[in-house]
Amino acid sequence: MRTFLSHTLLLFAVLSLAGCKKDDSPAQQTIADIVNSDSRFTLLRAAVAKANLGSALSTGSLTVFAPTDDAFRAAGLDAAAVNAAPVATVTSILQNHVLGAKTLSGDLPTADNTEVTTLGGGKIYVTKKAGAVSVNGARVTQADVTASNGVIHVVDRVILPPAGNAVQVASANPNLSLLVAAVNRAASGNPAVLTALTGPGPLTVFAPTNAAFNAAGFADVAAINAAAPATLANILLYHVVPARVFSTNLVNGDVTTAQTGKVTVAVSGSGVTVKGAKNTTAANVTAADIVATNAVIHVVNQVLLP
């Protein structure tokens, strides 16, 4: 009898210890707890503290697309930049990563660009195909990190909220000033160009850099303004696709543009290229998935020639 009691007490002790260990599992931690303890999220942690959102990430039922430190740095957001940014800006960025309900990767529809409303009221676009998930072109590198108040999906990019329509976003980038000048010059003869680029969309814009315009014979704004508006309109519409296509949605093949001609897209492990009908070589996409309210912008290093 004494042996039986000893074994029974030992069993209860083991079960009690097992129960204590279970309470410390990730599923018993809040989203805020996981962010605070995971070494990949030191910059996310700093942003959460800056925006004072720790309590918000400890309650409710949420989904958080969590950028790693590498993702923050790739967006130019190191610790100094996060701490120097206005609270409203950091809050807006963070809210663009949060959904107001727990959504596991298995619950996401297998589709391109499913529109989802974030906690901040903005829109993000989730793509799921062959089991891989991306959000606005940011890839989910680890899905379904469960917490007591929701789930975390780790992403490889910061999902920035749009800063305006396609023209407004381009206008804020000094490296795209000749593109903006070309849009304005084309609009003087064909208002439909500006209307399309500032309208509701959705669009994809392959945006040539200033260096790309220089190489195509447009040395400066004066050269742009000396060109025929109809010529510029024809070229610009050849850079616009009447659909929202993130880099993760691009596939090898021809794509029909708003000019009605086709460009040829090639996707490889080294990146994405786009070739116009009269280009001798393909343009490289040098910056992808810049989100505007009406478009996604991919910066290219050549002007595409129809």
Model-derived features with residue positions:
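Mature, structured domains of secreted/extracytosolic soluble proteins
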Residues: 2-8, 20-306
